[in-house]
Amino acid sequence: MRFTKFGKALSMGVLSAGIIFGITSCVESYTVGFLYITGTVTASSGTSGIISGYRIDHNVGTLAPIDGLPVSSGGANPVRAVLTLGSRFLYVLNRGVNNAGNGDCFGVGSAECQNANITQYAVGGNGILTAQETFFTQGQNPFRLIVDSSGNYLMVLDHDAPDNANPSSNDNCARALGAGITTCGDVTVFQINSTTGRLSLVVNAQVTAANGSALTYFPVPANPVDFVLTGGILLTLTGAPTPTSYPYTGGTSVWPYSYSSSSGQLTLSQNSVQPLGIHQGTNIVNASGVIYVLDNEPVTITCASGTCPFPAGTYPGQILPFTTGTGGALQAEPSGIFPDTASLANPIQLLVDSKGKYLYVANQGNNTTGNNPESGTAGYEIFTAPSYELQFIPEQPFGSGSGPQCIVEDPSSQFVYEANEYDSTVTGRTLDPNTGDLNTMRSTETWTLQGQPTWCLVDGRTS
């Protein structure tokens, strides 16, 4: 058969189109992980909690709801969740509500949270969650939840220890922390059954309660704000002012406990409370072996001469980087503090990408309704030679929804997601591995939730 020039060109065009279509259609789209988000059913506190779940698309990062979700969180006002034991179990901390029926809990009495609990879920291969059992902490107003790296122990930070209802200089707070201490927070420790995921209480082997029995919790200084595990040390960020609302902020100092991964025991370190020289600490994070404390108060950066990592000026917040020394003593990185970006406010969460090259700080902003221009994500490049140092990514800050509560990276290290409290959304961005930029996605990048989110986490197990 003979072809004219036009026929040949037409045939080649059809063939090329077929090849292109074939290649395009062979690009496999699959779920690379699951994104779970705790929150409330409606955009107000005090309502029943839920867990929403999404499948993360490997190619473009879009989110698709997991069949059967959302499900009840097992209580009111869920604030934290963790996965453990190979992502077979998920635990959700529900704060409960006060006598007024909302989640603004503090102290003891009518303002303290009632019916707080930890609800356990089994995680199915398709991401579905099935409720198992419910457990309870020893103190009041629980608000933080972590699991150790072995997956054998789970810890809950209670803002108020049981003895706070009747303060005394001879109570269990004083027995653990020293004479004259009348109030304290506490950590409740549970051992996780590796088969069933059931939690069992770990009692304090170091301190005997005033009634002669084993103490069922581990006291920490009053007004805790956050806590974090780093190796064999548990660090608790505490504040000076007694809070009159939630969330708890005003962190000023860090308290170390030595931690045993074989028994779950917390023992008093040789170091005492370490002041940080700040007054509005919001969070303490362990990322790639560095301890970061986020502080929501202005800092002035000066640049005497030469090249400085940050432009001189006054910034609305700061991040303090530390390494951990003997007994949990914090040692400041030689580079010193680094500022939050100038246009944002209220740093609340921090993420270091899986390659350890870039650091991102989610800023909640200061407006709870309407336009919130101070919400967004600050971005930094991490340098380790000749010494640890951070510098702003040129294209930062990056957009988010209004009032981000959490920031996570997907299991394939391609996408970053934030759950946003004030507009009840999830936002996603594509992570550029060469520049650290968080770019807009090729398709949808905002998903609407049923109500206000409080926390998010990613599961990389999809089978």
Which functions belong to the PLM regions below?
Residues 2-13:
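Bacterial N-terminal signal peptides that target proteins for export
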Residues 26-463:
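Predominantly soluble domains enriched in secretory-pathway, periplasmic, or organellar proteins
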